[in-house]
């Protein structure tokens, strides 16, 4: 019930911070602050379930960017904990038969990278399971626009062994997120026509990021889904997690389908392989999710974690924006639902 969910969240948000937590938050901030005045930090959730590494929890828990001062850091930690009990997080666990008592959450406080460019890299091709390819998707500013699928990012395919750039797709990136220097808040900026169509990463950056992806996979021992950010001449890896969709993608790729005759009216990126058909339902925002019935084709500008309950009913998913590494793509692959994005 919504009332119970709200009570649990409120209890987390209002709980007294014990001295240990307050000290840990301050120590983390002091460590990051060394040599800087009141640094901005990112407070990131990291959720996992015992013995269930095949689920991504993509977008289910909260992350807070551009947080400043220890009191606000402690508050953000509270809110990360409380995000275990949002309606969408509870639904995700129920639908996947998770024991709520065996789901855990860690909270990471890290330096906030005021990024000029950012995005996502996969150490294998997530749409085909080609283990010899690294996929990089990038946009200008903060990486939120790429991760959420709010823009169609540049896409780079790199050979994992030679680091040769095999393919580049430069898309029209309509806007970027950036930090307002006066308020410290994340703002949206519409890009000029020329900037929107400009290649985000140069060749040196692409190769540097690809090498980082390969190194991460070797360190963890399995394919990784990572987020990166660049500032100055440095590349930062801000998070990584195991790729959770290999088995379902392999099954879909192995299936053979007859080619459908007819005029091609739209094209996009194959984010999750397969074929699906059904009644097309266009969803303009989360308030319209009740439109979706079992077996429909869900069409939207983009998806977010609140769409998961509707996505699970869909026979196929199409979005205007996004790349092969965005939320819609990851969740579609996890559910085994055919999806085209961008």
Explain the meaning of each model-derived region:
Residues 1-106, 196-204, 217, 261-266, ...:
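N-terminal beta-alpha lobe that positions the nucleotide/phosphoryl donor
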Residues 40-42, 106-107, 119, 132-134, ...:
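Structural motif
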Residues 45, 111, 138, 228-230, ...:
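Active-site proximal loops enriched in glycine and acidic residues that flank catalytic Cys/His/Asp
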Residues 57-91, 115-182, 238-269, 313-321, ...:
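Extended active-site and interfacial segments that coordinate phosphate-rich ligands
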Residues 133-225, 230-232, 267-277, 288, ...:
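Conserved catalytic alpha/beta cores of large enzymes that bind or transform nucleotide phosphates
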Residues 282-342:
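Feature captures the catalytic cores and cofactor-binding loops of soluble hydro-lyases/lyases
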């Amino acid at each position: 019930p919504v009332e119970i969910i709200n009570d649990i969240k409120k209890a987390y948000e209002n709980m007294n911070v014990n001295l240990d937590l307050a000290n840990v938050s301050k120590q983390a901030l002091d460590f990051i602050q060394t040599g800087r005045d009141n640094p901005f930090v990112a407070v990131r959730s990291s959720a996992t379930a015992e013995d269930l590494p095949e689920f991504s929890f993509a977008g289910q828990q909260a992350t807070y960017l551009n947080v400043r001062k220890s009191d606000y850091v402690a508050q953000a930690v509270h809110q990360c904990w409380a995000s275990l009990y949002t309606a969408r997080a509870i639904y995700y666990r129920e639908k996947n038969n998770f024991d709520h008592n065996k789901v855990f959450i860690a909270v990471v406080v890290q330096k906030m990278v005021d990024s000029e460019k950012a995005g996502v890299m996969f150490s294998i091709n997530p749409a085909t399971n080609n283990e010899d390819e690294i996929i990089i998707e990038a946009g200008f500013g903060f990486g939120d626009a790429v991760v959420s699928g709010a823009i169609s990012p540049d896409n780079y395919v790199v050979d994992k062994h030679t680091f040769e750039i095999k393919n580049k797709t430069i898309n029209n990136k309509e806007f970027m997120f950036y930090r307002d220097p006066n308020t410290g808040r994340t703002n949206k900026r519409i890009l000029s026509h020329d900037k929107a169509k400009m290649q985000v990463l140069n060749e040196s950056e692409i190769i540097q990021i690809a090498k980082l992806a390969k190194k991460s996979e070797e360190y963890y021992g399995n394919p990784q889904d990572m987020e990166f950010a660049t500032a100055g001449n440095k590349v930062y890896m801000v998070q990584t997690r195991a790729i959770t969709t290999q088995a379902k993608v392999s099954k879909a790729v192995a299936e053979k389908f007859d080619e459908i005759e007819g005029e091609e009216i739209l094209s996009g990126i194959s984010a999750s392989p397969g074929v699906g058909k059904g009644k097309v339902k266009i969803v303009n925002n989360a308030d319209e999710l009740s439109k979706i019935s079992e077996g429909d084709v869900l069409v939207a500008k983009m998806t977010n974690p609140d769409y998961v309950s509707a996505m699970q009913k869909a026979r196929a998913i199409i979005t205007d924006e996004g790349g092969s590494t965005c939320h819609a793509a990851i969740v579609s692959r996890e559910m085994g639902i055919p999806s085209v994005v961008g």
